């Protein structure tokens, strides 16, 4: 990776499901250290864009290349032969936390180190002391160290989600994709998760791209917002430039009723 490498570069992405164009010639670039929100109505393509960028879904053959930190993830409808290696510095946070419920939070976070350890260590569950320390440091960093020994299934959604963020830190992620990370959380837990992401972005320089349904959170925590509608980018600019009129254009006339009393 060179100093000039973008955290994310996607060119002319297309993704179809039957007759539906989930992504319709979408291009997006994200600089290292940015925190970017992807917003838009349900079905607008924001989650699909994130999954294609992470090479969790394969775009159509007519699509251009996708790279993360200068390393190709896929192009022309084919995954890179080195996609597993290229994902090492990319963390992905899912809406449903993706933790193993029977394992402790600490054990779940240790899993983040598997990509850089010999296979036998993962099979036997034997982790070096420095990895164990990094896992505890990561839990402390996101504010859930006191729950390290508790089974993930016994934690709240917000605690699990912050544990998932800690796992990405142990992985060594420089770029973090978060797909609707607060969609199933109560307001207090949602705020804590977004504050954690913002602190990691500001203090550690972690690049964050997050899909959100909550426009007020996008405007509060992200400097840049990219809005999609029907698979196309309809806004890409600063959060403070996203006016109510533009939001009505993005979401439709129901926006004012649906978001009445909000911060948008």
UniProtKB/Swiss-Prot annotation:
It catalyses: phosphonate(out) + ATP + H2O = phosphonate(in) + ADP + phosphate + H(+). Residues 8-255 form the ABC transporter domain. Keywords: ATP-binding, Cell inner membrane, Cell membrane, Membrane, Nucleotide-binding, Phosphonate transport, Translocase, Transport. It is found in: Cell inner membrane. It is a peripheral membrane protein. InterPro entries: AAA+_ATPase, ABC_transporter-like_ATP-bd, ABC_transpr_PhnC, MetN_ABC_transporter-like, P-loop_NTPase. ATP binds at residues 40-47. It comes from the Bacteria. Its EC number is 7.3.2.2. One of its GO terms (cellular component) is plasma membrane. GO terms for molecular function: ABC-type phosphonate transporter activity; ATP binding; ATP hydrolysis activity. NCBIfam families: ABC_phnC (TIGR02315). Belongs to the ABC transporter superfamily. Phosphonates importer (TC 3.A.1.9.1) family. The complex is composed of two ATP-binding proteins (PhnC), two transmembrane proteins (PhnE) and a solute-binding protein (PhnD). Part of the ABC transporter complex PhnCDE involved in phosphonates import. Responsible for energy coupling to the transport system. This is Phosphonates import ATP-binding protein PhnC. It comes from Maricaulis maris (strain MCS10) (Caulobacter maris). The lineage of its organism: Bacteria, Pseudomonadati, Pseudomonadota, Alphaproteobacteria, Maricaulales. The gene is phnC.
């Amino acid at each position: 990776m060179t100093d000039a490498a973008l955290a994310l570069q996607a060119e002319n992405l297309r993704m179809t499901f039957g007759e539906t164009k989930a992504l319709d010639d979408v291009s997006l670039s994200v600089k290292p250290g940015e925190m970017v929100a992807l917003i838009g109505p349900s079905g607008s393509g924001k989650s699909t864009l994130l999954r294609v960028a992470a090479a969790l879904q394969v775009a159509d053959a007519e699509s251009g290349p996708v790279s993360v930190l200068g390393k190709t993830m896929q192009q022309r409808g084919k995954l890179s032969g080195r996609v597993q290696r290229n994902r090492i510095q990319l963390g992905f946070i899912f809406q449903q936390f993706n933790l193993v419920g029977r394992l402790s939070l600490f054990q779940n976070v240790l899993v983040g180190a598997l990509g850089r350890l010999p296979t036998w260590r993962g099979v036997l569950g034997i982790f070096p002391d420095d990895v164990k320390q990094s896992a505890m440091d990561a839990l402390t960093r996101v504010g859930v160290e006191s729950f390290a020994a508790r089974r993930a299934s016994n934690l709240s959604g917000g605690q699990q989600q912050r544990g998932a963020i800690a796992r990405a830190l142990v992985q060594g992620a420089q770029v973090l994709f978060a797909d609707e990370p607060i969609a199933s959380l109560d307001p207090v837990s949602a705020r804590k998760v977004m504050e954690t992401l913002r602190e990691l972005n500001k203090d550690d320089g972690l690049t964050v791209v997050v899909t959100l349904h909550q426009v007020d959170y996008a405007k509060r925590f992200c400097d840049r917002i990219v809005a999609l509608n029907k698979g196309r980018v309809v806004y890409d600019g600063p959060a403070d430039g996203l006016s109510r009129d533009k939001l009505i254009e993005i979401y439709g006339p129901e926006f004012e009723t649906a978001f009445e009393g909000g911060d948008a």
